[in-house]
Amino acid sequence: MRNENRFHEVRFVIITGMSGAGKSIVIQSFEDLGYFCVDNLPPTFIAKFAELIRQSEGRINKIALVSDIRGGQFFESLQSALYQLNELGIEYEILFLEADTTELINRFKETRRKHPLWNQYNSIKKAIEEERKELEVIRTQSHLIINTSNMSPRQLKDKIRRQYTPEGEYESNLFVSIISFGYKHGLPLDADLVFDVRFLPNPYYVDELRPLSGNDDSVEQYVLHFDATKQFLDKMEDMIQFLLPKYLKEGRTQLIIAVGCTGGRHRSVVISNWLKDKLLKTGYQIALQHRDLDK
């Protein structure tokens, strides 16, 4: 009973639907959300897979799997799998993806891929129509149906993130990494945004501050008390707060912000610490690294 109770805390999503409707994009989106993902799982293995998850005793609590006609004997096997899940008392939800026939035909032509039922019907249109008929029953059992005909990949990803992110946690889907660095040691090659703060007054030239770092209160107070610093921080914060929702909407899951000064020990450390404290209040996941602090 202990394992069964724990499975009620698991979110178990079965992704299915029309070939070409965007299941690959959707499973990638679930992976970005931290789900344990399986693509192209034959329906006959779904119940066994769920049992294994239940035996993990809560170590895996978000699962998404794709099961479609690629798995073979799909139409009968999926109904059997759902029956087994119900018999086992395993809760699940079905996400069904579809698109208009004309749109699906265009997608197969653009990608030059064969519809999985092509060999049976030798016609893309006929294969799509037959697949749609066969999927009608499972469609009526689905908890959510998404028609992707007029959706770009980015819009589909955003739809999944908003649908499957707990209320109030949408911003946490974007991981922001802040890196302080020294230009004398080279730019971080993977940075998305770079702020050069070498124009700020340098504590290095203050004898009592030189041996300290930007993590020390006296250095922080020195750097932050200048009007130029205050103006810069206001403008930088406005820019970043404007950009983060845009990046999130675009489908980004990670953003690397680099802040550089000459040596990476004083000014960039102070500014990076300040930025981290500001962004933590917005709900985004934040990581901070002082790359060159000890060099």
Swiss-Prot record:
Family: Belongs to the RapZ-like family.
Highest rank taxon of the organism: Bacteria
GO terms, molecular function: ATP binding; GTP binding
Record's keyword annotation contains Transcription: no
PANTHER family from the UniProt entry: RNASE ADAPTER PROTEIN RAPZ
Binding-site residues, GTP: 68-71
InterPro entries documented for this protein: P-loop_NTPase, RapZ-like, RapZ-like_N, RapZ_C
Keywords, comma-separated and alphabetical: ATP-binding, GTP-binding, Nucleotide-binding
NCBIfam families: PRK05416.1
Keyword Nucleotide-binding: yes
Gene3D superfamilies xrefs: P-loop containing nucleotide triphosphate hydrolases
Protein name per UniProt: Nucleotide-binding protein Nther_2024
Role summary: Displays ATPase and GTPase activities.
Residue numbers binding ATP: 17-24
